[in-house]
Each structure stands twice: as structure tokens, then as C-alpha cells.
Amino acid sequence: VTSGVSLGHFTLAPAPASAWANTLSSATTPARVAQPVPVTTQPNVPYAQMPNGIDIASWQHPNGADVDFKRVQKAGYAYVFVKATEGTHYKNEYYVNDAMAAQGNGVLMGGYHYADVSTDAAAQARMFADVIKVKGGASLPPVLDIEEAKGLTAAQLNKWVRTFLQETYNRIGRKPIIYSYRSFLMNQMGNTSDFTSFPLWIADYNGKQSPTLPLPGGWKTWTFWQYSSQTRIDGIQAQNVDTNKFGGTMQQLRAFAATGVVSASKK
């Protein structure tokens, strides 16, 4: 890669030659990942056909209990996002085991970082990248979970997010997913459209079969939708688990895991 990657209203510099991207297959190199193709996920893909998934953290391990991903997969959940890190101080002790167990049982897996915008973004991205470089790596792109402003202005928040996304890309060679909720994107982040070419994972517990439209921040479509935080899942001892929909078919989800791009569905 010899030139920067244009994403939204700012440009990611090319990942260094030594980045972890070089250990990935050619399908996940930055040149391929950086060409998102918008896709209308509804009504082309009926709600019932959108793959279900979960996201978990240490809370889903009460008293150190393991997650039985074989049962999770049989219950109809095709993917999981596992919390890896938070700020510069926390690493999820269950991350590696969860990542390996999920992929060993046919569940697509990605890691997420919970942002602490009161501390350095680049340092957080570096720690996050180090943690998620487990054996085999993650099948889904990395995720930035941004949901606390901690007194920062919209401009300061957006700068923080840019820095984190750039450093994560430098370290991993994959364009991150952005997770947040509607009011945070609209209010704390000023409804910025700077990040619209990054995949959106939106939290919206509206009880419907689609997130509230129009989406915040100028996004034309969503990639993942967290629609509940209170689901009981076979194989997980915790009472409540976050559940999600992927905005496409299972075939598109597998392709997204390989490329970071949601391709248009064939009619």
C-alpha cells in the first residue's frame, strides 16, 4: 500500500509494513478492506433471516463459569463480540479462552475495546491490538465501543476517535467497526458524518425489527444492531446477554468476516 485510505472526511495513513495485516490472508489486507460497498439491508433481507449474535464480557462468567459455545451455536447464534480491553488499565481475563472456544465451535468472533476518552487514544489502541492478537486472530474486524464523553466536546471526541481508529488500523490492518448508541452519536459526537464509511454497530432497544431511522451521523445503513441487553442464552450462565442482528445474510456475514465489506445481496 503506497497511499492513504480515504474513509469519510479524513484519511487513514497506510498501515506500516510490519503491521499485523501482513499475517492475514490477502482478503483482509487494507487495500481490500478499505473499499466499503453500501448495502440496503432492509427490506431485501427479512428480519428473520438476519444472523443472530451476542456480545459478552467478564460479566457473562459468573463465579468464573465458562461459556459453552457449542450450546450457544446450537441455540442459533452465529457470531460473538468479546470485550478485550478498556482504557489503558483493563484486560479481560476471559478474552483468549472465549475467542478460542468460539472459533473452535464455529462461531465467528471479534474483539471490542471499551473507550476511556480521558486517557490517550493511541495507547489504548496499541494495548487493544496486542490483546486481540491471539492464536488464529479474530475472524471479525476490531470494534471501538464509544459511549462515554467524560466532559469532552464533540470536536475533542471526534479527534480521539480518529486517533484510535488510525492506530488500530496501523496495528491490525483492518478497518474497525464503531459501536455506540443513537443519542451519543447525535449529541455527544455532534452527529458528525466523519465516520460513515466505517461499519456501524448501533445499540437501539426500540422493540421493532429495525433500528430507528434515519440513522445518526449520516450512515446510510447499519452493519450490526444490538437490539436487546436482556436475553437468556443457552450455554451462558449469566442472566442477561446482549443480542444482535447482522444487517445481511449468513453468506454476507461470512464475506464480511473475510473482507470487512458488506457486499450487496444478489436478487
Question: Model features per residue range: what roles?
Answer:
Residues 10-58, 194-267:
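Functionally critical loop-and-helix segments that line ligand-binding/catalytic clefts
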Residues 127-136, 155-165, 184-193, 218-235:
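Short secondary-structure transition/capping segments
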Residues 140-215:
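Catalytic domains of cell-wall/extracellular-matrix polysaccharide-remodeling enzymes
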Residues 67-69, 95, 124, 157, ...:
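Surface-exposed beta-strand edges and their flanking turn/coil or helix-capping segments
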Residues 63, 71, 99, 118, ...:
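Solvent-exposed, flexible loop/coil residues
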Residues 1-9:
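Secretory targeting and sorting signals
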Residues 38-171:
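Substrate-binding cleft of extracellular glycoside hydrolase catalytic domains
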Residues 89, 118, 185, 209, ...:
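Flexible, glycine-rich phosphate/dinucleotide-binding loops
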